[in-house]
Amino acid sequence: MRTRAYEHTLNSSTVPAGSPALEIRDIELRFGGVVALHDVGFTVTQGHIHAVIGPNGAGKSSLLNCVSGLYHPQQGSITLHTGDGGTTHELTKLPPHKIARLGVARSFQNIELFSGLTVLENLMLGRHTHMKQSIAASLLWFGPAQRQEIAHRGLVEEVIDLLSLQAFRHKPVGSLAYGIQKRVELGRALTVQPSLLLLDEPMAGMNSEEKEDMARYVLDV
């Protein structure tokens, strides 16, 4: 069963369920003479979970890096659908920050969090693509900037509740167990309010109990 918080607040997609959300066609990625991806193509439908399965070195992370803009394939197309009006975006030439603003969020195979910051601070960083006030106004923290941060904090608190992170809210991420850190990284991706969520081996290195918890959270999303 989906949680009320995610259905009503965190999911930014307006693509109808069952319609194409992402279309990948004939992708080829090379690093010098090494072919990482060749003739890769599939369609991701809105409201569904899709898995890319393969052995180590098969190119799974490279494919996600292409979708999120960290890599740019030499050929092929990656088309993101962002609305029920037929709006599409070609991602193969876009930088990562522009793809993130289109609603694509991801976690990484190796944890990419700020270990010296608290869980709350790491999750607030996921809201940066939605912040509209200037740095100066944010530093002074008054008027619109204050109201903006309060609104962002409210959404982050929903993510904390969704992922059962209440007990770790003010703890530095670097002091937490590995499984909790993976959960925080999922949370940071969710605070982007993604229309497309990419999870790179979200259960790697976890014990069986942590895997069960993560599977439950992903299904809730």
Predicted segments with their positions:
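Glycine-rich phosphate-binding loops of nucleotide-dependent enzymes
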Residues: 2-221
